[in-house]
């Protein structure tokens, strides 16, 4: 599944921002708009036992250019909340459910 970082209208959002994947399915987060974005999973909002550091980008790392991607595969079933650290305050957050 491909998730866009930034809406076509310039909004600071994940598109879609709520989605479901199968365990082990590849999730591709793709910079859509050229603003610097990243993908960080909230350590308090993921299944217990999952290491957020192993599935998140470093808070200092950013996808700067349109078309740059970050890929992750989640295997533990449950719900995972994530955000873009530069734009979390603007509401750039999302949730994925792994079945």
UniProtKB/Swiss-Prot annotation:
Cofactors named for this entry: Cu(2+)
Family annotation (PROSITE patterns): COPPER_BLUE
Residue sites binding Cu cation per the record: 37, 84, 87, 92
Keyword Cytoplasm: no
Domain of life: Eukaryota
Domain Plastocyanin-like: 1-99
UniProt keyword annotations, A-Z: Chloroplast, Copper, Electron transport, Membrane, Metal-binding, Plastid, Thylakoid, Transport
UniProt-annotated location(s): Plastid, Chloroplast thylakoid membrane
Molecular function GO labels: copper ion binding; electron transfer activity
One GO CC annotation: chloroplast thylakoid membrane
Membrane topology, from the record: Peripheral membrane protein
Function: Participates in electron transfer between P700 and the cytochrome b6-f complex in photosystem I.
Family in the record: Belongs to the plastocyanin family.
PANTHER family reported for this sequence: PLASTOCYANIN MAJOR ISOFORM, CHLOROPLASTIC-RELATED
Protein name as annotated: Plastocyanin
Lineage: Eukaryota, Viridiplantae, Streptophyta, Embryophyta, Tracheophyta
Gene: PETE
